[in-house]
Structure formats: structure tokens, C-alpha cells
């Protein structure tokens, strides 16, 4: 591990407190060995008692599911804020991670505005870190005027031929661009593992988009290219993460800038047939594709790939969480773990609401019980 300069006492104290908070919360979260408890559930009220033992739930099925999803979102935000607020001046990277839910909610609101639907039932509240004024819905100018989202005001959401997917891709690009910039402003120690994990996430997100657009929307390879986030990063530092899938090849590095394209794998995937798995052999993310099943015809499954990608980022975050305990890397991984947990808990709750068992949901998501 490379040597890094010592930190001031005040900074070290805040970092130690934030890390202790994160460790305490992770110990009670449904990650690692505690995930298995979710596979034993068979009803929504059991789920409610396990995750929120302090509350009583007497609501009917559908209403109970909505209430639990609302509480899960609040729980995740509360747990992330508990760590971020340990800092007198929180690192911008962590605040931008927190604000991912604001970006997601804004995209949902834009779809609702375009379709003349009422305000979504559940929206995040991240307190002083929020910038979108959701209470002004559906007045878009009042919602986002003066924020980093003001560029959206030039779009005609209700035009007959308006491409909402293209706008969402633009919003995603802005989120990850600003996230990467905040990462690069940190000292080397604080971005050692965070940069690796974020680079993998962006690459995989591009690949998921490419698969979804080609499969569900029947976009051509040329049409799909414009939706991808063609972001670049400096060559990742030589930090080994157990379970990392194939180090990046030198061919991905721009000869002039020495930087790595995070759209490279997605661009490569655009020219692989969706019905011949053998053609994907040698592709960096090949192991995350759905396997061939006997003599059945194979077709690329975007949902399978997305679930596998999510588990991969989770495993990297889990392995890196404690490797540099008093650096921003730890809190970065912590927030990744909390987001994974929220997605998993929401999926289990939705499955139970449909009459599935927890183990059935695990099988659907390819999560080991």
C-alpha cells in the first residue's frame, strides 16, 4: 500500500468518528451474513417486524407495501446522513452520492410531468443537501430554477416526439461527471479504491443501458451510442481488490491523454449479436451475462446482467470498506453498501407483496441464500 501524509488531529478525529458510525450501522444492516435472514421471510408483516421492529403494521397488503417502501427510503437516507453529518465540512463526493436519490426522483417527476400525472407518492428528503424544490411540482421552473438542473428548462417535455430516455441519459451523464470531478479533487489516499469502484460502476451502467436499449427498445448500435456516458478517467492506481474482474487493457487507454474510456466495453458490446453467447467470449464483462441453458436458444438478458453487475459492485464495496478505514474510501463504500441494501430490501418487499417467498426473490435476483 502506498504511503500517504498524516492528517491533522481535527480531521483525523472526524474521520474516526464517521468510520465508527459507519461500522456500527453496517453491523446492523442487511449486508454480508445478515442477508440470509431475508430469505426466510414469507409475508410482508414478517418483513416489517424484521427490518422495523420498533413499529407496528396493521395495514392491508398494498398499503403496507407502500408504507414499507417509504420507510426503507427514509431509513437509507437517515443512515447515510448519520455518517455525512459526522463531518463539519462533508466531502463533496459523499454529498453527491447522497444526492443520487434526488437525481432519481427528479427523473421520475419529469416522466410524470410529461404524462400529466400527479406528483410521485414517495420522494426523498435529504434536508439541507437537497437542491430540487419538489413541493413546487409540477412547476418545473420553480422546482429547478437556479440549480444544476436548469438546463432541463429548455426541453419541451410534452412535445409529441420528445425522447425522455435521451434526457435521462443526459441527467445521468451530469451526475457521474460531477461525481468524478468531486472524486478527483480528493487526496490520493481518499480515492484509491473509490476511483476503481466508480469506474467499474460507470462502465457497467453503460453496458446495462446498451443491452436495455437494444433489447427492449430495439435500438440499432448507432442509435444506442448517443445514450452512453463517454467519460474518461486517469489510469486506475495499482490497488488490488479481491474479486476484481480482469484489469483494464492498455487498448482502452487514449494514446494522447493516457486516460481510460469508461464507455469502451459498452461500445464493444454494441456489435455483439444478442442471440449468440459465443460471440461475447473475451469481452470484459462476459462472466456477468446470463448463462446458456441446455439446448434452449440463448438471448442476452439485460435484467440478469444488471443484477449481476449490482452484486459485483456490492462485493467490491464490501471488500474495500475496511481496507482504508480512516479515508473517504470507507464512507464511499459504506454509501454503496447502503444503496445495495435498499435495493435488495425493496425487491424482497415487492416480492413478498406478490405472494413470493424471500428465497424465491433471492433465486430471481440470483442472490445466494
Model-derived regions: residue spans:
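N-terminal domain-start signal
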Residues: 1-369
